[in-house]
Amino acid sequence: IQACLVQSVFSQCTSRAAIAADRGIIGGYGLGAPCGLGYGLEAPYGWAGYADYGYPAGAYGIDAYGGIGEGNVAVAGELPVAGTTAVAGQVPIMGAVKFGGDVCAAGSVSIAGKCACGCGEGYGYGLGSPYLY
């Protein structure tokens, strides 16, 4: 179920080669490129720059999944998950997340970004910016 959820959300496969390739996420035109995170979060061309997500980022492979619509995910029973799940891109969530019953988990979760409600407020974790990337 988790694999189907990640595949349907991102509609693409991000391999190690795609991440480290010359034009991948950390390659010559990726996050560490001159117009990406390499110049800092609040630099003129960083993620907090022009369009909040880097002015030229969409043209070089940093883009949302592009899906539209609304969906519900229901899980009944046990869902054993082991290993590491790496997600690159944006996860647009608008609405509420609700859990019923006991949810036992071990490990760590890191969530960064800004809300999708349109208020323009970030999570406020510092770094000189209301956004944490």
Swiss-Prot record:
One GO CC term, this protein: egg chorion
InterPro entries membership: Chorion (IPR002635)
GO-annotated biological processes: chorion-containing eggshell formation
Highest rank taxon of the organism: Eukaryota
Keyword check for Membrane: no
UniProt entry keywords in alphabetical sequence: Repeat
GO molecular function: structural constituent of egg chorion
Record flagged with keyword Transport: no
Coiled-coil ranges per UniProt: none
Similarity comment text for this entry: Belongs to the chorion protein family.
Job of this protein: This protein is one of many from the eggshell of the gypsy moth.
Protein name: Chorion class A proteins Ld24
Lineage: Eukaryota, Metazoa, Ecdysozoa, Arthropoda, Hexapoda
